[in-house]
């Protein structure tokens, strides 16, 4: 990084804006951005560097002590060090940003290289693009050396005289403006890099058909733009950028690596008659001491010798324009000379130095020319090698399988991600180090200020003591007789007091100035901190953008991979189709060939047969001729006597011929020898036919084999396709797993939990965390689950975030369905486990009181009383009272440390575990079967003409008032006339240790056959409580003596009806059991969701309490920016969670509405009832009737509320 140099000029001048927003004003703030190297800042011993320090009041140096002067010098040195450190930190940050940008470029470049196509497709695509784009014009090779010479001249000349001091007396520039300039420079660099990338992409495509000479010509040409403006009264040259030249042709990116200094070196020159020169670099900062070019003969300046370019003369004027040799020097002079060159227009720079520098430059240029020739040859060889390697790679790429390419891409992506993560870690570490260093510096400065203040206070104390001593001496002298000596002594003492007062005033002023300086530094640090926060936010935004870019690149790569796979599949399908077509063509060709062969064979056979026939005919003719000759010879030799015999034989033959004609067909007129020949021909034909048949069968077998092979190939191809699909699925699964892992990591990074709404369900994972919390200690998991269930049910029932005790005690029969009750007893009883009395529980709204250990009575607001038996579990929760139980859950939030040791022992003792099942809530689906049971029981009651009802429905109105609604059929007709019968003995209740609720229901039905805790009274419609143990019946007297006979007759009919109803009830029970199992699962899920929400709320409240207990004693502007970011992130997450929760609530409401509609539809279908006339019953008949009903039917005690929460299987 180049050091940033700044300079201010106080004289105001007019501003002339240029193209890029920079002002062509030499008296504005002169700065050098990062692209231009400036000489190192050195301060001469006579003129030390002055930093911006507030002006102090003039004081005599004789009055200031030495240690104060030393302290001030130390402070100044520390301030200088702090500013240097801040500059170094900014440079490091800029370096890191550049590294990130380079990484992004590498990723894009690699992604472009990886996204290859088939070679043929690449050729087609490149041809189309080349047709649409203008091709670069070829240029001579010799221009490369010229351009390189110019660039080398510029680089060499800019590095001359770096050891000379640069003016530093008037340098004062604020860090805020520097940072703004750096931001502008970074934006310009980003724009330039984007343009550079676009040009690279275009030229890579164009260079595939261009030759090596053209690539060499385009690599070095136009890399520097040398322009001139021949104006008479212009002080500075024009400003140019890379974007202003549309014909820049950079060439291969690998060539650019060798010519990195050639880019962005845009130099401008200005020749004037008034001997005033200057130049503006790329970013608008003027360069001082520019040498003059021999552009006109009127110039009074001696022209230096120019470089020989393309055979031009040494003393000829150089043409001004592109590819011209312009020698520019940055001769840094003393500060006075620099001010003169800027402020005074008539003073010219030193020309002798320029001439000397030009001579040195010419020597350097000659060396550079030789080096460039060697470089060009090496570049030629490198380009050839690179092209050969690329061709080989392109030939090898289609042969590589897709899986290897995918793996390589994934590995490269992983490496890039690792590099980015490392860079981010380095950035974070550097930022932390910088923050720590700043804090240490601040602390040191504060300590030093404190030490100085203490020293000053001590000096003040010393002066005060000395002043008091002097006053005492004066007082003693004044008491003595006055003499001139005493007056002189008094005057001397008074002068010393005056000096002491002056020194005290000086110290006080210094202390005030220190305080003011501290305040000013604090005020200066505030904008710096704000800027740091802004920078961090910008870095985070950049990181987020980078992540988005990476995701987009990954998506593009995935899409391209999918496209490539699809193309590969299409190619395979085309290959398959081609193979099939080829196979069909082969089959057709084979069939045609076979036909042709058969035809040829037939023709050959016919020809052979014809030849054989011709040969046979010739043989026959020859034989006949021989026979004739023999006959003639014999005829000559034999006498005439034999002629008569021959004649006789001939006559006999002539007689035999007609007989043969009659016996044989005309075809058999041939002699015996031809018949033998035909038989041989037939045998030959038969053999040939067999051979042909064998050949045909072999051909058929071959065809079948070919078909089988084709089928096998098709199967293999199908298997390959399946494997590819499986691989794609595996890749998708891996991607999903990676996404899930990232989501899990993000969730783990969230330190603070989100706020939880009060009535929302807790997540299952949060519930597990709650149950496994270390605050429970050794408490059993069963007790933990029961406590959590109670709290969830209370939250589900009650409205609002807080639970009211009044609502709880009014709805205690509804909310804690799965509650395991504590061991409760009156104050007179003693608990068997602890040996201590257990107090009676009383609530705020109503009273809870106990008859015995096993039974609990509580009173509703309707004036009626119900009983909760031991079925809910009396020995699970070892808390003394119901109210304390609620306090532990609601107010203390599961803080079990407040429990007594006895209660904790009960919680951790395995012997106290329940041996009975724990009940849970019923869902709405179970209500359907319960309504059917109610309708059947009503049929039984109507048929029996009784006023007793087994099904007592307790409904909750508006969530607060509970009313027991009984189905009362003509209660007033029953009149008490006889005393009540004797009470029957109670059968003890022994619950089964199973976890199945059905077995408990059966036990209850069997055990409570003779129990009847509720009997209707004709005079009082309210149900009265019993004062005995449940399990002992206590019926009241009913005076119904007139209807005994009628009731006996009706009982016989009712028994028959009950038997039928029992069968129906058994079926209904089975349905209920299935529904209960389903609903229990749903309830458990809801409870788990609620518990997680509660835990999140608890953790959030604890963190808020900790923050309140340990507040940060810092200014709001000095807070850690990470905390602010975390808070913002948490707020966003909270909003997302709220939206999700609202959606879940809407879905649940919709489901509930659908279930309610189903229930109403089923309830609206009333069963057919057989109504019979009402008859009066006697007391004995009533008791017997109750006994039969309890024995044969299910006495369900159903308690309902507005939330459809039903307590199941509470039997009496």
From Swiss-Prot:
Give me the ranges of the annotated region Disordered: 1-70, 119-169, 211-231, 248-374, 655-681, 935-957, 973-1125
Give me the stretches of Low complexity compositional bias. 48-70, 119-163, 256-275, 322-340, 352-373, 998-1022, 1037-1125
One GO cellular component this record assigns the protein to is:
Set1C/COMPASS complex
Highest classification ranks of the organism = Eukaryota, Amoebozoa, Evosea, Eumycetozoa, Dictyostelia
Q: Polar residues composition bias: which ranges?
A: 1-31, 276-285, 292-317, 341-351
Organism per entry: Dictyostelium discoideum (Social amoeba)
Tell me the protein's name.
Putative uncharacterized protein DDB_G0271606
- Top-level taxon: Eukaryota
